[in-house]
């Protein structure tokens, strides 16, 4: 969002232009922001949510811009779950592939247990953790997405709405939040 530099001198974006970003977390029941962080526009989306903390057992649904191993570690240490699109160049090892139902209407195309590999995963301390990698058909857009999660049932119940709108479903006692 563009702002006037003479009023918001802290929000310098370019030499003669000011800008801010509003990083939000949406409450899944009310669809209203429950956490807001206003920052200068040059701060990355990922860094804009560093201070977001959620109640235990929250399922946090993030877009690929928040795909960050240290963020994953933080979410797991806070006893929360994550669902996010996996980056195409992510180094991982497939440990086990799960059978899928014979139902042709089933939108999950692949479900596997994985371990993240590489120096970045090792440095973040998540190289020994088990994740699920799920390939999902997003019917509204006619394309596949590849997701990584710590709670596979959450992905299955929430995935339809990750990119089609801002409504996220609850699973069990956990609630789903979206950082945007």
Predicted stretch roles:
Residues 2-180:
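Single, function-defining residue in the core of a domain
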């Amino acid at each position: 969002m563009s702002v006037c530099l003479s009023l918001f001198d802290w929000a310098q974006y370019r030499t003669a232009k000011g800008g801010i970003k509003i990083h939000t977390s949406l409450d899944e029941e009310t669809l209203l922001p429950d956490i807001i962080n206003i920052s200068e526009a040059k701060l990355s989306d990922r860094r804009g949510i560093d201070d977001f903390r959620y109640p235990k057992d929250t399922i946090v649904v993030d877009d690929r811009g928040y795909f960050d191993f240290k963020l994953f570690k933080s979410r797991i240490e806070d006893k929360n779950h994550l669902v996010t699109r996996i980056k195409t160049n992510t180094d991982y090892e497939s440990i086990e592939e799960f059978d899928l139902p014979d139902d042709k209407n089933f939108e999950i195309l692949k479900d596997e247990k994985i371990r993240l590999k590489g120096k970045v995963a090792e440095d973040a301390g998540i190289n020994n953790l088990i994740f699920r990698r799920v390939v999902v058909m997003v019917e509204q857009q006619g394309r596949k997405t590849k997701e990584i999660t710590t709670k596979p049932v959450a992905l299955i119940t929430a995935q339809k709405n990750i990119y089609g709108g801002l409504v996220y479903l609850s699973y069990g006692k956990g609630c789903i939040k979206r950082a945007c």
